[in-house]
């Protein structure tokens, strides 16, 4: 944490094909070792697969999937009197989308299809329908928060 001033947020440029900032952020999340062109190819390939499979606008599917996967609450560990409690806290909007993107990436990685573009396309389609690995992760996080609701008075 800086002592002098608040560090400004970096502005992310929208992606070249769709002009969407969320898609550009997702590409940055997917990117490994600074290879943005590879991440771009994966995302656009996944969007092509979505267009062929669902006959819908890929951006629409992407935003629906993101909306479905975004968590509302999560748990944070808090130490009180020698015991650790999992305290449910609300997730701020920027972290919501960051978590959703990470979960989509991880769920896509674990899938069995041949190419990453296919895996990502299928994961996005499933997430848009409310199923899949990323949705499972979200439900798990929500379940944890629900189970530890009794400790919500230990606010941060």
Swiss-Prot record:
Keyword entries, A-Z: Ribonucleoprotein, Ribosomal protein, RNA-binding, rRNA-binding, tRNA-binding
SUPFAM superfamilies: Ribosomal protein S7 (SSF47973)
GO biological process, one term: translation
Intrachain S-S bonds: none
InterPro entries: Ribosomal_uS7, Ribosomal_uS7_bac/org-type, Ribosomal_uS7_CS, Ribosomal_uS7_dom, Ribosomal_uS7_dom_sf
Gene3D superfamilies, per database record: Ribosomal protein S7 domain
CDD domains reported for this sequence: uS7_Bacteria
Pfam family, one: Ribosomal_S7
GO CC terms in record: small ribosomal subunit
GO function terms (MF aspect): rRNA binding; structural constituent of ribosome; tRNA binding
Superkingdom to which the source organism belongs: Bacteria
Annotated NCBIfam families: rpsG_bact
Role, per record: One of the primary rRNA binding proteins, it binds directly to 16S rRNA where it nucleates assembly of the head domain of the 30S subunit. Is located at the subunit interface close to the decoding center, probably blocks exit of the E-site tRNA.
Description of how the protein assembles with itself and partners: Part of the 30S ribosomal subunit. Contacts proteins S9 and S11.
Family note: Belongs to the universal ribosomal protein uS7 family.
The protein's name: Small ribosomal subunit protein uS7
Organism: Polynucleobacter necessarius subsp. necessarius (strain STIR1)
């Amino acid at each position: 944490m800086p002592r002098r001033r608040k560090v400004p947020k970096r502005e992310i440029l929208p992606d070249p094909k769709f002009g969407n900032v969320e898609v550009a952020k997702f590409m940055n999340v997917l990117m490994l070792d600074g290879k943005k062109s590879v991440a771009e190819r994966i995302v656009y390939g996944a969007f092509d697969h979505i267009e062929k499979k669902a006959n819908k606008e890929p951006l629409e599917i992407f935003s629906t999937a993101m909306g479905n996967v975004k968590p509302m609450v999560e748990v944070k560990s808090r130490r009180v009197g020698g015991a650790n409690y999992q305290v449910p806290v609300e997730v701020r909007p920027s972290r919501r989308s960051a978590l959703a993107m990470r979960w989509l990436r991880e769920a896509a990685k674990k899938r069995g299809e041949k190419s990453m573009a296919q895996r990502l396309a299928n994961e996005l389609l499933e997430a848009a329908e409310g199923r899949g690995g990323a949705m499972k992760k979200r439900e798990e996080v929500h379940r944890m928060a629900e189970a530890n609701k009794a400790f919500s008075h230990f606010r941060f």
